[in-house]
A protein has these predicted regions:
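Short beta-strand/turn micro-motifs at beta-sheet edges
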Residues: 86-87, 164-168, 224-230
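Pyridoxal 5′-phosphate
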Residues: 19-20, 224
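Metal-dependent amide/peptide-bond hydrolase catalytic core
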Residues: 2-14, 35, 55, 174-367
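Acidic/histidine-rich catalytic neighborhood of metal-dependent amide-processing enzymes
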Residues: 109-175
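A non-catalytic alpha/beta surface segment that caps or lines the substrate-entry region
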Residues: 31-71
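Acidic-glycine-rich active-site phosphate/pyrophosphate-binding loop
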Residues: 77-92, 169-177, 288, 320
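Acidic, glycine-rich active-site loops and adjacent beta-strand->loop/helix elements
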Residues: 80, 95, 129-137, 160-162, ...
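Active-site metal-coordination/substrate-binding segment of hydrolases
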Residues: 46, 71-130, 333
Length: 367
């Protein structure tokens, strides 16, 4: 792949690292959620240049397939949308800066190059997906993949775990909206006001979740007050509840409705938590690859939510999340990735794919 011409004032891209070239190209294309078209087109161009059969699907996802054998069917899925707010793209002191450098264009670019490293001779097939709208409540891209693709034999979801860390699971997510209206009245009237009831609904939710709730523990629910606005006559509040595996969302909604009789509580979205095990073939392959590259392996669960949740709702297949990058820089004003970190991520993914290619448990699961 040729190295793009350097614009005036733009740092040069190292010509000996095609994977860095690819990430640099991706970062130069803004792709906030809902506006991923140019980025998807660039991803297709890059994948075709690396030997993939590639195109965009009806949802706008960039999809590339390489290999055509009868062995394991692997899928690598990351997202190509970002939050809003651009960051000047630059390469400085071994770091590549730009919106999406961590979340999640680096994991996606790493997947593209890892699949290409195994090439058309891969004994099975590798499908790489750059999904749209992961940063939105509906996860449009992952939902479309879930509905239009056969479940793969193994799935790697691309998010910034750090090159030596494998993510085994994520909390689920419950988005709620509470709306209430009350007859207009004087502020001194002791009758409940709409704004007061909305605030009371929030405190009732916290009470129902219990004193140990919070975002610091994978095993406990945690809530965030996303919005609260109104006046004595009309008010609205929105809540984001992160839920652990096995959490009874129906029981929570019943109890909250029972204790907030004046308003209307609406479930906007519900995504269950997901957690795999250390014995999962994908976890084993990624973990072995980290160790083979001299990494101090870490296996974690996260209190956020990702496309792994969305896909696990319908696909009961081996899966884990992995990708280069420091997740503490997600959405940050100085979002960047260390080039060394990124290239290690490419190598780890490549090693893991080779291991999965010979994992007989994957093909046996289809027979």
């Amino acid at each position: 792949m040729s190295v793009p011409t350097r614009a005036p004032g733009r740092p040069p891209v190292p010509p000996d690292h095609p994977a860095v070239d690819t990430l640099h190209r991706f970062l130069r294309i803004p792709s906030p959620s809902g506006e991923e078209g140019p980025m998807a087109a660039e991803a297709v161009t890059v994948m075709r240049g690396l030997g993939y059969r590639a195109g965009t699907d009806a949802a706008g996802n960039a999809v590339g397939v390489i290999g055509s054998g009868d062995g394991p069917r692997l899928m690598l899925l990351s997202h190509i949308d970002t939050v809003s707010g651009q960051i000047p793209v630059r390469l400085s002191d071994g770091r590549l800066y730009g919106r999406g450098a961590v979340d999640a264009k680096a994991p996606f670019a790493a997947m593209v190059h890892a699949g290409a490293a195994l090439g058309p001779g891969f004994p099975g097939s590798i499908t790489v997906v750059g999904a749209v709208e992961e940063e939105t409540p509906g996860s449009k891209g992952a939902v479309a993949v879930r509905e239009t693709h056969r479940p793969p034999d193994a799935l790697v979801v691309g998010e910034p775990s750090g090159w030596s860390t494998v993510v085994l699971g994520y909390k689920g997510k419950l988005d709620l909206r509470y709306r209430v209206t009350r007859p207009p009245t004087h502020p001194s009237n002791p009758a409940p006001k709409a704004a007061e009831l909305a605030a009371e609904c929030w405190h009732t939710l916290l009470d129902l979740l219990g004193p140990d709730s919070g975002h610091g523990s994978f095993g406990r629910p945690g809530a965030t007050l996303v919005a609260l606005h109104g006046d004595p006559a009309a008010a609205e509040a929105e809540f984001d509840v992160r839920i652990p595996p096995g959490f009874d969302t129906d029981a929570l909604l019943r109890a909250l409705r029972d204790r907030t009789p004046y308003g209307e509580l609406t479930e906007l979205q519900a995504v269950a938590a997901v957690r795999t095990t250390r014995r999962d073939p994908v976890v084993r392959a990624l973990s072995a690859a980290v160790r083979a590259h001299g990494g101090e392996l870490s296996q974690k669960v996260k209190t956020a939510t990702s496309d792994m949740n969305t896909l696990a709702q319908a696909w009961d297949v081996p899966m884990a999340t992995y990708g280069p990058g420091d997740s503490r820089l997600d959405h940050a004003d100085d979002e960047h990735i260390e080039i060394d970190e990124y290239l290690k991520g490419v190598s780890v993914l490549t090693h893991a794919l080779r291991r999965l290619a010979t994992d007989e448990t994957l093909t046996r699961s289809r027979t």
